[in-house]
Amino acid sequence: MSPPTQSLQVKLLDPRFGDLWPLPAYATESSAGMDLRAALEAPMTLQPGDAALIPSGIAIHLADPQLCAVILPRSGLGHRHGIVLGNGTGLIDADYQGPLLISTWNRGREAFTIEPGDRIAQLVILPIVRMGLQVVDTFVDSARGAGGFGHTGVR
């Protein structure tokens, strides 16, 4: 696998990293995200409908205001077990330096146990474009216009 093109400052908040658990890393050459682990002291069971903030065991500092990080669910956990993020997506601003917490929600029908070290989410770094607002009275017409939910149909 080719080496990363940029570096990310990471604080290890859990001593099990490097010993019991590897650092977050890209699993394949084309992976967009690095898996985040549940830095729990003991197994945690989420009953259907329960939500919990789970520590990732790391803190990051992007420093570059043209970047952000997002915490996203792992597709298999959501599809097979109903384990998703309680906040949909976790947005991490470039100047945030605190611990990464994973809002985890069991939207499934069965209890699900998360073990210490389980990979429960993924971290993706994205570019940011900051826009200035231009107040207008009307927009130039577009093909879609103001068509909202369901506007383009399903077929």
Swiss-Prot record:
Organism: Xanthomonas euvesicatoria pv. vesicatoria (strain 85-10) (Xanthomonas campestris pv. vesicatoria)
Biological role stated in the UniProt entry: This enzyme is involved in nucleotide metabolism: it produces dUMP, the immediate precursor of thymidine nucleotides and it decreases the intracellular concentration of dUTP so that uracil cannot be incorporated into DNA.
Pathway annotation from the record: Pyrimidine metabolism; dUMP biosynthesis; dUMP from dCTP (dUTP route): step 2/2
InterPro entries per UniProt: dUTPase, dUTPase-like, dUTPase-like_sf, dUTPase_trimeric
Annotated catalysed reactions: dUTP + H2O = dUMP + diphosphate + H(+)
Cofactor: Mg(2+)
Residues reported to bind substrate: R74, S75, G76, N87, L91, I92, D93
Annotated GO MF terms: dUTP diphosphatase activity; magnesium ion binding
Protein's UniProt name: Deoxyuridine 5'-triphosphate nucleotidohydrolase
EC numbers: 3.6.1.23
CDD domains: trimeric_dUTPase (cd07557)
Pfam families for the chain: dUTPase
An annotated GO BP: dUTP catabolic process
Highest taxon listed in the record's lineage: Bacteria
Membership in a protein family: Belongs to the dUTPase family.
Gene: dut
